[in-house]
Each structure stands twice: as structure tokens, then as C-alpha cells.
Amino acid sequence: MTDRYSKYTKFEFDRPADRVLRITLNNPKTYNSLDAVGHREFTYIWRDIDDDPDISAVILTGKGKAFSSGGDFGMIESNMNDETARIRAWKEARDLVYNIINCNKPIVSAINGVAVGAGLVAALLADISIAGKAAKIVDGHTRLGVAAGDCAVINWPLLCGMAKAKYLLMLCEPVDGETAEKYGLVSLCVPDAELQDKALEVAKRLAAGAPSAIRWTKYALNNWYRMMGPAYDASTALEMLGFAGSEVREGLKSHLEKRKPVFDPNSPV
């Protein structure tokens, strides 16, 4: 792999076909969770991909049994206890979404197993999202005790409708690959054994297509997301505001203790 990607330490890279780059989240022992370094790399790698003249399509997947379990507990605790870390997380969360939206290369996600948090952001913002039947897609923000930020407010209602988006986001309801396809959250669902081959097939077709036409189509369609920028910015700010509150402390504690959270029913909101 070229020096362009040698600075990224949390991912594996390979080129399974001509002009196709595959990025594999590589921390299988923790279901490909992202620490502070991984989160930052995941945010800014899309700028290098955008500038890479040697690739025409990208595959994103996870190593082992999961796509990604999102930010690790260390990141959550830092966001709770350190204002500087919280502001940095807000900035990276913002940049991650816009960097994916603005990346000129078409992105194919191959969603294997659990997809949560920042990993789920990329999985569902991908231009073509392909889930294995055993995929488990869940936005766990409200279960943790913070508002659903990331990009859910701008893409879930577009993908599956406002009514279903509210149901899934407010209740942190998990969906498998087949259900995600039924709801419109993903482009396709395939048997798990066929997932990587299908993602590669799609990426090769994209790489062989008319590059300007495909990139302009992506750019135009993603204006739906750009128009929702103010809503996205508000949701992410509210998420970060929650990290300074009490609900997230109970959410994290209950998760570590493997029990249901018991939140104070009173709220000034």
C-alpha cells in the first residue's frame, strides 16, 4: 500500500481489484471499537481517499465478527469528564459526516455483524450499503443517555421514514440485515457467506463505470444531506451537551454492570 495510507494505524488496506481500495477496521478483539486515535483516523481518512487518483471505488468492512462497536469506553469517559475531549469529539463527529458526504469516490459498506456508533455512521452514509443477514444495526445513543447525534437525524428519516426513524432511535431498537433492507436502511441484504463477494462485485462495477457521471450523481444526491446541515449540527451539539450531564453516567454504569439503566424521570428539558 502506498505511503498515502501508511500513517493510518487502526485499519488494514488492500486492493482486491483494479482501482478498488478496501478498508478493514482492524480491532477484532473489541469488535472493531475505535479509541481516540482510531476515531480521528476514521474521520480524516476520507480526505486522502478523495485525493487519491489511483482508486475509483472503496469498500469499508470490519475484521472478524463485527463491523464496528463504535467509540470505546475510554472515549466515552473522556467525553464525560474532559471538556477539551468533548469539544474534540464534536469536531471529529462533524468532520466525519461531511468528509464522507464530500468524498468523491463511491463507497460500498459491507456490514458484517454489529454496527454501532461512528462505524454505523460510515456504514449507512456509504453510497451503497450491503448487510449480511446476521448484521445487527443499532443506534444506542439514548440507551447510553445522550441524544441521537452522529448523522442519524439527517439520514435515518430519508432512508426509512420519520416514523420508523423515531421508533428505532428513541428506543435503540436493533435490526438485523433482512429487517434493515425491508425498512430501507440498507441497499441490500445477502447471506453472510456472500457478503464480501457481493461488496467486491458492486465496487468493481462502480470502478468500471463512467467516473465523472457517478461522482456527479453522488454529489447531487448528497445535497439532500447538505441541506440538512443545520439539523445535523444541532443534533451533534445536543449529543455533546448530554455527555456533560447525569444521564450518560447512569447509562455507562449500567452498561458496564450489564443491567438496564434506571434514569431519573425528572428532566429540565
Sequence positions of predicted segments:
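Terminal peptide-recognition signature
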Residues: I23, N27, F42, L60, ...
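Conserved CoA-thioester-binding segment of acyl-CoA-metabolizing enzymes
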Residues: M1-K63, Y98
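Glycine- (often His-adjacent) and acidic-residue-rich active-site loop
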Residues: Y5, T30, R47, D54, ...
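Crotonase-fold acyl-CoA enzyme core
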Residues: Y98-I214, M240, G245-K253, R259
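Terminal low-complexity tails and localization/encapsulation signals of metabolic enzymes
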Residues: M1-F11, K253-V269
